[in-house]
Amino acid sequence: PAPESGFIRDP
């Protein structure tokens, strides 16, 4: 999924 505010999660 797309990154959130300042937080990158695995796709």
Swiss-Prot record:
Keywords: Neuropeptide, Secreted. GO terms for biological process: neuropeptide signaling pathway. It is found in: Secreted. Its main location: secreted. GO terms for cellular component: extracellular region. It comes from the Eukaryota. Belongs to the FARP (FMRF amide related peptide) family. FMRFamides and FMRFamide-like peptides are neuropeptides. This is Extended FMRFamide-10. It comes from Austrophasma rawsonvillense (Gladiator).
